[in-house]
Amino acid sequence: ILNVSPKLGPDYTLAAGQKFKSFSVYEMPFDSDDRERKGLFKRRLHYTVAPWATENPIFMHLTSSDPDVIRTAIDQCATVGYEMVIISFGSGLNAEDISEENIAKYKSLVDYARNKGVELGCYSLLSSRWISDEVDVINPKTGKRGGMRFGSAPCLCSDWGYEYFHHIRTFFEHTGMRCFEHDGSYPGDVCASTHHTYHKGLEDSQWNQFHKITDLYRWMCENGIYINVPDFYFLNG
């Protein structure tokens, strides 16, 4: 008998009138022990249940947020047939800044790129960053932050976490960017805090954080935004 369940949680409190969405499991029987044939089976499974896994745009990473440099890169990509420019790590772009000035700056660049047949995207760092004792995930072994997958990381179900996702979505809605490169995407860190607004404690922390980040990825997929994230999110686009 196959038993599939989370190692922790969900420990979800379902209020009257609410709906609970559980996890999905895909089973695929093989008709052969041949390694190559099994590989083809796995490929067909991913193409069927996650067709976005076939997306493979030709893109350029750009480490500058200077509008003149970005336009030059767009022109170069249009000339050689590249499909996308990602304003990447070290560029200075801040997708968490949803001020009118920042939105206007990047929307004008998105419009310029689209007129050239090129899409524009951006980078954002999430997990491997230290915010504060009140925001970061709490290690259940120590009762303090630190010692997690990337050292320390913000809890996605803190007020800071929800604000982060609101800012990212707002930035994409208003600029029209079509690629999101997420660095240090949620790696499964648990959080023992009992003071974060959107989870109760350790038992529901992983479940709620995972669903928070996949909600963003699903929204992006629904709106034609290419997501450059680790493979283990392929089935949650």
Model segments located where?
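Active-site neighborhood of glycoside hydrolase catalytic domains
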Residues: 104-105, 137, 143-237
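Conserved structural scaffold segments of CAZyme catalytic domains across common CAZy folds
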Residues: 1-136, 162
